[in-house]
Amino acid sequence: KKAVKPYLRQFLSDTRVIEPPPPRWIWKIILNAVILNLRPKKSAKAYQTVWNTHGEGSPLLSIAKYQKAEITSQLEKRAPAQFEVALGMCYGNPSMKSALAELESKGCKKIIVLPLYPQYAASSTGSVFDAVAKELLTWRNVPDLRFIRSYNEEDKYIDSLANSVKDYQNVYGKPDFLLMSYHGIPKRYFDKGDNYPCQCCKTTFRLAQKLDLKPDEYQMSFQSRLGFAEWMKEYTDQTLKALPSKGMKNVQVICPGFSADCLETIEEISEENKGYFMESGGEKFGYIPALNDRPDHIEFLTQLLLDNTYGWNN
């Protein structure tokens, strides 16, 4: 609980993540007086269920370290002694500050920032941009900087997703229905111009096309809503509760917007939402893991980085 509280304070204080209507001080009171006194205990219990499931400690951090190691290895093979790779997170550690300080100490003059969010959203990728910009404000010599905004339309990303589905189904069989669940955003963010849901639609359509799915064999949904405001629909939990009554009793779920498994996939989808589905009459539920450190995923990310060095001589 003590470890979760500072993380939640940092996360929920990010105005990219939570855009409270003015006056903002009302949200600060709610956050500090209510949420930070209730939420940490619940979140801590959830984290206990996923701790050490993918190595030591947080699954997200463990997988991110694997990804970093594999990408570093691939870059070294393809361009020896040309790249340094650092891992940074917007909230918690290793921080964005420590990652950029590491690159600065190694004399890096050209930096590519790759947020591991396939679909751009102001509340995710936008926060990464803000964190990087904040740290670079302190640099005397600002580096050449390239920022990869999104990669949801890259063919190799779609191929990796399709391969992960096929690999899973080769072991567990095909379901009646495939649900593609993405992290949700409040509808008013979309109304203000955030095209994240449109990118999710494109990913869903292309993946379904790659898997040769019929329209009645798949659906897109959004998870992790918070509070009482309307979020982008359809909601994942409500969708899973309704599927058995429609004859879909063997369901598999994939979360294409997560490059690494974390609390929201392992606990929220494969445990909590599985429970909703089974309690509603479902018979078989499968969660298809995130791309994590799959070789085809690492190969794609490595090539994406190399492609974004175009025009840099050294």
Q: Model segments located where?
A:
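Active-site-proximal alpha-helix that buttresses catalytic centers in soluble enzyme cores
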Residues: 1-314
